[in-house]
Amino acid sequence: MRTMKLAPSVFGAGIGNLSKQLKILEENNVELLHVDVMDGHFVEKMAFGPDHIKMLKELTTIPLDVHLMIEKPERKLDTIIDAGADIITIHQESTTRLYSCIEKIKSHGVKAGVVLSPATNEDTLKYVLDKIDMILLMTINPGEAGPGFHEELLTKIKNVRELIGDRDIDLEVDGGIDNTNIAKCKEAGVNVFVSGGYVFKGDIAEKIKTLREALK
C-alpha cells in the first residue's frame, strides 16, 4: 500500500511567522513542504526562487517538493538544485527538453517529476514514465490560489494511476485540496496531497489532523 503524504504549500503560509509555522509542520510529521516557483511568464504571478529555497532548507528538515512554474526550466535547474530542492517537478508544457531536464535533475541525486495542467492530456506521460519519481496533477490552473477543486478531474487522476501501474511513482494533486475532497482524491489514486490555504488558515496542527483523519 502506498504511503499517504501531506505536502503543505508554503505559498499559503504567512511569511512573518514562517519559522513558527514550519516548526508546527515538523511537530505534526508532515512528509513534504511544497514550494511553488513562479517566474511571471509561464504564469502571471511571481513567487519564490533559489534564495527562498535555500532559506527554507536552513529553516526546516522537511524535504522540499519544488514545483517549477517557469518557462524553459532547463535554464534554472542548476540553481534550484544547488539551493537544496529534494524533488523538482516541471510542467510538460513549459519546455521542449522535458527528457533532458529529467535526466539532469536525477543525475544530481534529486527526484524528478512532471506536472500536468488541467487541460493537458495525460498521454504525454507515456514517454517518461520509466524516468520519473512523481507526477503532479493540477486541479486548478497554474498560478491560481484558493478554493476551486474541479471534481471532474477525478477521472483524469484515475487514468494517470492506471498509466503508472506498479511503477514506484508518487501521484500528487494540487489545487483546492481540503478535508471535503481529499478522500475522493485518495480513492482515485493520489498519495501525495498539496494543501495551502486550508492548512495555514486557522490552527495548523488541527488542520493537519483533520486531513489525516479524512484519509483513514
Task: Show where each model-derived region lies.
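Glycine-rich phosphate-binding active-site loops on the catalytic face of alpha/beta enzymes
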Residues: 88-97, 136-146, 188-208
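Catalytic cores of alpha/beta
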Residues: 74-82, 120-131, 177-192
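Hydrophobic faces of well-ordered beta-strands that scaffold small-molecule active sites
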Residues: 5-9, 33-35, 64-68, 88-90, ...
